[in-house]
Amino acid sequence: MSGPRPVRAPRGTEPSALGWQQEAALRMLQNNLDPEVAEHPDKLVVYGGTGKAARDWRSFDAMVRTLRTLKQDETMLVQSGRPVGVMQTHEWAPRVLIANSNLVGDWANWEEFRRLEALGLTMYGQMTAGSWIYIGTQGILQGTYETFAAVAAKKFGGTLAGTITLTAGLGGMGGAQPLAVTMNDGVVICVDCDPRAIDRRIEHHYLDVKADSLDHALQLATEARDRRKPLSIGVLGNAAELVPQLLAMGAPIDIVTDQTSAHDPLAYLPTGIAFEDMADAAAKDPAGFTTRARESMARHVEAMVGFQDAGAEVFDYGNSIRGEAQLAGYDRAFAFPGFVPAYIRPLFCEGKGPFRWAALSGDPADIAKTDKAILDLFPENESLARWIKMAGERVHFQGLPARICWLGYGERDKAGERFNDMVASGELAAPIVIGRDHLDCGSVASPYRETEAMLDGSDAIADWPLLNAMVNVASGASWVSLHHGGGVGMGRSIHAGQVTVADGTPLAGEKIRRVLTNDPGMGVIRHVDAGYDIAESVAAERDVRVPMREGDEAHEGDAAHGSGAAREGDGV
């Protein structure tokens, strides 16, 4: 009988599948469920409250079995964590196509999703859980680091030294926050209701210390701030209680955000319920639990707004807590901005986003060599060099060794081709898997996060992630995914992902060049279409073809030369 057991990706240079593309998908699926990586591997939950890698253990076994026998001209189809077919395609086609959690508009809500999930018909794939490219907390670390660096540049003279940040949530995503703040030389208090999450972040060196109480946490924070010493402090408790308490205490907080699992009310602990009773309470009365969770979120957000009124820099970190608080009746829920319009969108306009890779060999030396390759490729990028150096020194690998760094249009393809050459020459022991978060410049429609406050009002236009998925299929990605609801919950986002394998072959090189050009290119054209000047400049400088812009240029040229004048070649 298929059921829970420890899962770990194979290491080494010998594939058990019929090709490295299939082997890569197999190893990354298994890596997502490695106990070092997944939050609740026995339940197939990788991160984000309920984000799963497979619908059930029987489906997991079927995917493993199928990937091992999949031919070089075949494609496995995965419907919400279950393999539903194998089709003959061709060598340029993806080996796996994945669709997770997608529901028709009027049915796209948590209640209907849970009804269908209970029937065994779907699963919640989050972003990289169901698309098999989660690499542990490092996966969000640089984005979090860059966000806090942007906060520092905006308000604190380029450093967080001498500041205290308050946040909550130390799960797979939120667990990046303490290290991201201390990398920017700041002090941070991190609240979580799960003692295991706090202990795990300390074990993985993302969190420095655990406070005995809220008063103790504040004492540690102020002492470190006064010495301008970086320090991250975990404190056990319910954010809906502790954040308002800190506000009432007049705590000297400079920055406030949140990464609890607010996107799913059943994953947010209401006040008055003990953490140990949370799962039973949610299962027994999901509607009542949801109401109580939203009421608690409203108090949490009200306190965040209170800190903003007191002068703190406050932002939503993309977990939909503002929307949930608004549903509970709090009318100032959107008084503070989301992190993308506040800090990240200029990077998106340049086609920049979270480029990540993993060493299928399992050898950390392969990542060290790729780190050096990145530094050699982009010697002028000082912030990238600082990140790679810090990551090499401070990031704990979870599962297969991996790295993330933000690269833009015209950079990702260079990195991918270099990695492929290194595999071909034998410098790397085994192929490299290259992917990204779905949180990227041109792959998401999410009005509460990535596409919040778009210049042209196109926040909810969902054509872009669909086009992104299709162009990655057409370009030769190894597997492509199209999900709904990741990050912010059902009905609030549609997003796509791609993974491409550098196996050292000339064919892989051709695929890499296309995928890693076209994928970030979608970010450039999406922001050109929305009217962003930065994106317009990038498109012009780097020869990104945008037909509507070409039409405008042609029209301007005609006007300049006289539209009625005969021109050479017109046949007149």
Swiss-Prot record:
GO-annotated biological processes: L-histidine catabolic process; L-histidine catabolic process to glutamate and formamide; L-histidine catabolic process to glutamate and formate
EC number of this enzyme: 4.2.1.49
Catalytic reaction annotation: 4-imidazolone-5-propanoate = trans-urocanate + H2O
InterPro entries xref list: Urocanase, Urocanase-like, Urocanase_C, Urocanase_central_sf, Urocanase_CS, Urocanase_N, Urocanase_Rossmann-like, Urocanase_sf
Keywords, sorted A to Z: Cytoplasm, Histidine metabolism, Lyase, NAD
Active site: 405
Coiled-coil residue windows: none
Subcellular localization(s) per the UniProt record: Cytoplasm
Cofactor binding description: Binds 1 NAD(+) per subunit.
Compositionally skewed regions (Basic and acidic residues) per UniProt: 550-559
Main location class: cytoplasm
Top-level enzyme category: lyase
Residue ranges, annotated region (Disordered): 550-572
Associated pathway: Amino-acid degradation; L-histidine degradation into L-glutamate; N-formimidoyl-L-glutamate from L-histidine: step 2/3
Binding positions (NAD(+)): 48-49, 126, 172-174, 192, 238-239, 259-263, 268-269, 317, 487
GO molecular function: urocanate hydratase activity
GO cellular component: cytoplasm
UniProt cofactor(s): NAD(+)
Role summary: Catalyzes the conversion of urocanate to 4-imidazolone-5-propionate.
PANTHER family per UniProt: UROCANATE HYDRATASE (PTHR12216:SF4)
Similarity comment text for this entry: Belongs to the urocanase family.
Protein name: Urocanate hydratase
Organism whose genome encodes this protein: Streptomyces coelicolor (strain ATCC BAA-471 / A3(2) / M145)
Lineage, opening ranks: Bacteria, Bacillati, Actinomycetota, Actinomycetes, Kitasatosporales
Gene: hutU
